[in-house]
UniProtKB/Swiss-Prot annotation:
A GO biological process held by the record: translation
PANTHER family: RIBOSOMAL PROTEIN S9, SMALL RIBOSOMAL SUBUNIT PROTEIN US9M
Keywords: Ribonucleoprotein, Ribosomal protein
Recorded superkingdom: Bacteria
Residue pairs linked by disulfide bridges in the UniProt entry: none
Family: Belongs to the universal ribosomal protein uS9 family.
Protein name: Small ribosomal subunit protein uS9
Alphabetized GO MF terms: RNA binding; structural constituent of ribosome
NCBIfam families, A to Z: PRK00132.1
Source organism per UniProt: Bacillus licheniformis (strain ATCC 14580 / DSM 13 / JCM 2505 / CCUG 7422 / NBRC 12200 / NCIMB 9375 / NCTC 10341 / NRRL NRS-1264 / Gibson 46)
Length: 130
């Protein structure tokens, strides 16, 4: 018999993460590497594990992630979003817990585009009075 799997897609900035939850002992594999090899910051790794700790499922699932686009922070946010969605598929009773923590909401903040006549999105060229 095929083993049970739960899927979730997470997005943040320009990163997209395809997350698969498989019953296991709590390992997190990102792009066929351990999470500590892929994401350098311990704070970001804790951020990724947040949905699992909130729902007390940290040791019950192995998390297999395929993520692309963006940087470390965006990828961490996308993975977290994907894990939350996959947990919801595994057990719909987690909805209130995850929703209250804001883990099911897609963070819509994006980089603001650069405008012509300016040095950045809002930074104006230096003003000279004389």
């Amino acid at each position: 018999m095929a083993q049970v799997q739960y899927y979730g897609t997470g997005r943040r900035k320009s990163s997209v993460a395809r997350v698969r939850l498989v019953p296991g002992e709590g390992r997190i594999i990102v792009n066929n590497r351990e999470i500590s090899e892929h994401i350098p910051s311990a704070a970001l790794i804790e951020d990724i594990k947040q949905p699992l700790t909130l729902t007390e499922t940290a040791g019950t699932y192995d998390v297999l992630v395929n993520v692309h686009g963006g940087g470390f922070s965006g990828q961490a946010g996308a993975i977290r979003h994907g894990i939350a969605r996959a947990l919801l598929e595994a057990d719909p009773e987690y909805r209130s817990t995850l929703k209250r923590a804001g883990l099911l909401t897609r963070d819509a903040r994006m980089k603001e585009r650069k405008k012509y006549g300016l040095k950045g999105a809002r930074r104006a060229p230096q003003f000279s009075k004389r």
